[in-house]
Amino acid sequence: MGSSQSVVTALQTVLKQRDLKIAPRTLQNFMKEVDRVAPWYACSGSLTVASWNKLGKELDRKHAEGDLCLGTKAIWKLVKNCLEDEACHPAIIESQGTLEEVQDSMSETERSERMGARKRKDMSKKKGPPQEVKKGGEKEGSYHSPLNKSKKKKKPESSQYPAVELEALELDNSDSDTLDSSEEGGLEEEVARYEEKRYHPDRHRPLKTKMNVRPPPINPAGSRPSAPPPYELRLNTGTDSFLPLEERRKIQMAFPVFENAEGGRVHTPVDYNQIKELAESVRNYGVNANFTTLQVERLANFAMTPTDWQTTVKAVLPNMGQYMEWKALWYDAAQAQARVNATAGRSSGHLTKIVQGPQEPFSDFVARMTEAASRIFGDSEQAMPLIEQLVYEQATQECRAAIAPRKSKGLQDWLRVCRELGGPLTNAGLAAAILQTHRYRDLSNRKACFNCGRMGHLKKDCQAPERTRESKLCYRCGKGYHRASECGIMDSGADKSIISLHWWPKSWPTVVSSHSLQGLGYQSSPAISASALTWRDAEGKQGCFTPYVLPLPVNLWGRDVLQAMGMTLTNE
């Protein structure tokens, strides 16, 4: 009987790991049936899947012969599901050790008695389980009716396990080894619900207890968990999230929420004893003592909110001055960690591509380089030698010349030296602006008027009366209303020929030249033919040239055409 009781204790430990509780009397009846069917299990069995499956085959054989009590197979299924669950592995190892100790202490006489008893039972077995009938028609050892059980039922003791207890199945605690059909069906339903909860956790709804009251905390009195338990999930259909139930439990542990019996979320303050012990440690040993540090580390095991930490520190420190100092340091550490979290893993490109602009201040360039390096390396102080080398190589020539004699002084000294370098207000910037202004002024004075031909103003600003066009066609070309003396002016000293925009076909393409024209007038970025043109004279001579196209009243033939014709410019 002692070995069977040890197996019952081991089974209770395994079932409690899955929040299942079966009455000890029911497990004892189950082990009696196991000892009758397979007495070898108490001697050499183990809490392994292979050994339990072997026991299941023995039970199936007896069930096929009609020699198995009701409810035995259902309890076997519950234990098998627990053995296959990885969450029950620690409890299984502990129970297996207890079972092995009992088996080792079992004498050879007891072993032989168990095996001999099995042989005697096998020889005297019948087709059905032995039952004796009393005069009243009631079978001996049978369970009482539900009506009688309600009268004899004792007040259940308060359990410290929040799962649904199997006493809701109304199993009797009598000495009978058999179960009636209703109890067998209830136990089978419990097995089905357990398997549904295990293999389909998202479809499972939390079962309500008899009194519809939130179960008590899991931990027994006197012990404290490492972190507060998360609030209970209230799932509807399981289709509102793609995450499995276990993953959602891990997410909730990041910031636990407490719920009361009605389901409302409440705030649970820090335990008074914890605060009292920490305050006494600070008062007796100081804030830097090892014992005080240990107390703080003990508090760190709990999932405390920022408000909880502030309240706790304010309560344990002796004065508000130390609290304000701690709060300032705490804020600095939180902001530093927030910056690290925000910039970690977000690089802004290659550091070699960050170059100081011509008009960019040296301080802005250093700030861009330091920010990019902190995003890549995390801590910019550790990468400071690399940052200094990149800043020196990719700064402007003026800044490099100022840094070179003080290259070993560090980045702060470089910022001080280059503070006045770069930007539009430097000597180089002012000189460039002055030269640019004088250049534009000189160019404006060298422009010629197309109306009067004088320098210093444009045609739109000319005060002279506008010249009228000739009313007759030119007798030389027969095309334009101009004088013959102005028709196709020959070499005027120009190197390139210029075609009047009036005679240039609109379908011929032009491009903007990168050179400027300067003679009697000035033209910046003039238009030039997009392709070379071919000219041919009356004598059969021909050549190629690329003329400029300007809004002139006449065409100007330059040396690029006249020299090919064999003409030269003389002063005769």
From Swiss-Prot:
Listed Pfam families: Gag_p10 (PF02337), Gag_p24 (PF00607), Gag_p24_C (PF19317), RVP (PF00077), zf-CCHC (PF00098)
Compositional bias segments (type: Basic and acidic residues): 132-142, 190-199
Listed name of the protein: Intracisternal A-particle Gag-related polyprotein
Species, as recorded: Hamster intracisternal a-particle H18
Transferase listed as a keyword: no
Annotated site, Cleavage, chain positions: I92, I93, F255, P256, L299, A300, A431, A432
UniProt-annotated catalytic positions: D491 (protease)
GO molecular function annotations of the record: aspartic-type endopeptidase activity; nucleic acid binding; structural molecule activity; zinc ion binding
EC code: 3.4.23.-
Cysteine-cysteine disulfides: none
Span list, region Disordered: 99-230
A GO BP annotation: viral process
UniProt cross-references to PANTHER family, sorted A to Z: ENDOGENOUS RETROVIRUS GROUP K MEMBER 24 GAG POLYPROTEIN-RELATED, IGE-BINDING PROTEIN
Stored InterPro entries: B_retro_matrix, B_retro_matrix_sf, Gag_p24_C, Peptidase_A2_cat, Peptidase_aspartic_dom_sf, Primate_lentivir_Gag_pol-like, Retropepsin-like_cat_dom, Retropepsins
Alphabetical keyword list: Aspartyl protease, Hydrolase, Metal-binding, Protease, Repeat, Transposable element, Zinc, Zinc-finger
Enzyme category, top tier: hydrolase
Segments forming CCHC-type zinc fingers: 447-464, 472-489
SMART domains (UniProt xref): ZnF_C2HC
This protein's record includes keyword Lipoprotein: no
Gene name tied to this protein: gag
Domain Peptidase A2: 486-561
Segments of skewed composition (Acidic residues): 167-189
PROSITE patterns reported in the protein's UniProt record: ASP_PROT_RETROV, ZF_CCHC
Compositional bias segments (type: Basic residues): 117-128
